[in-house]
Amino acid sequence: MRKLGILAMLLCGIAIQAQSRLDKDYKDIEDKVIEWRRYFHEHPELSNREFKTAEKIAEHLKSLGIEVETGIAHTGVVGILKGKKPGKVVALRADMDALPVTERNDLPFKSNATSEYMGEEVGVMHACGHDTHVAILMGVAEVLSKNKDKIKGTVKFIFQPAEEGAPPGEEGGAALMVKEGVLKNPDVDAIFGLHINSQTPVGMIRYKSGGTMAAAQVFEIKVKGKQSHGSQPWSGVDPILISAKIIDGLQTIVSREMNLTNEAAVITVGKISAGVRSNIIPESAEMIGTIRTLDYDMKDKLNKRMVEMVSTIAQAYGGEATCTITEATDITYNHPELVEQMLPTIKRVAGAENTVAQKAVTGAEDFSYFQREVPGFFFFLGGMTPGNTESYPHHTPDFRVDDSGLLLGVKALTEMSLDYLNSNKTPRLDVKPKG
């Protein structure tokens, strides 16, 4: 009995020593992570154009002695870190791309970058926090490379381009990375990822088991009318009027035909184009938009009704219209067993009081493509300054997050990786997620 007590004390001492070493590494890396984040914020690049971002990431990984592969899915970077002992393979993912948004923030590291997007010169900004994701994962790579002796297995660092969507006519993002074999050689057993959130206080982690973020689809509606003089609408068929009726009708599908007590659904028209002059009723109009759903049956019903409604409304006003729907991302599905397995780690790192279960959100994430292949866990990291009552929404010129929240992301991904690799549990994706 006494020997068992001595052994327990020795093991406890080793664990404390190991944690103390990690804590020192975290302290040493924090300023670097903030510096990297600010560099990437000041030098953003659009989807599939993350050339300099990828170059800086690859340079850092190589300096750590990590095996590096570049050019995956255009600009993607993958690093492979093998531990002291063989074992499972865990992947960690960060997205790299920025958005065509002109920054309004008055920051010392404000983006003044511009680029061409869909034929127009636009401002470029990390308006969704991908700069923080890259910096965090670079920090995790450095901490883990200093602690290879603690790693039983392999860590694969995935720096992904084009999460916001590839430019028209191009492939990209997580789907292309999967297609090009990013989860193979070595085969990944589980994948973790995070997203900074400007409406969650620094120090907090939010999560959900099961369906967490919505499936996203893109729709294009083409309306054909009959051109006429603006002073004689009776001699033509007005595609702008038809478009207005269609937009109104689409919202009734959500409000009157979907059971929103089960799951949320959203139809948003994001762009409408028609006409060239104030006194000409044009021949045609076009609309594009997004659909968000968290239930596959609801998604199928909504798609069917959209196509029917667009056509019948146009016919009712003497015109024609078609609705084409394409897939963008699947439901982001957190594997319940993996969530249960990793929650103690997150609570240890963030504190139980700062680890909060949340409801599903209608935002979408192409991290879902990885989760279709292997069990995954995607969570939200607080980025709102403590005490603030005002947040800065994602995808806007005013978006901002507090750098002081980044270190928690480094700690969470580092210790989730170590705990997962050192555990005997390996949840399997026996059946692909169905919402």
Residues covered by each model-derived region:
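Bacterial Sec-dependent N-terminal signal peptides
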Residues: M1-R21, G435
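Extracytoplasmic/secreted proteins, especially bacterial periplasmic and envelope-associated proteins
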Residues: R21, D28, K32-E35, Y39, ...
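Divalent metal-coordination and catalytic microenvironments
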Residues: F40, G79, L92, H130, ...
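Metal-dependent amide/peptide-bond hydrolase catalytic core
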Residues: S63, A244-G435
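Soluble non-cytosolic domains of exported or imported proteins
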Residues: K27-D31, P44-E55, A127, D131, ...
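Hydrophobic beta-strand positions in extracellular immunoglobulin-like domains
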Residues: L81, V223-G225, I291
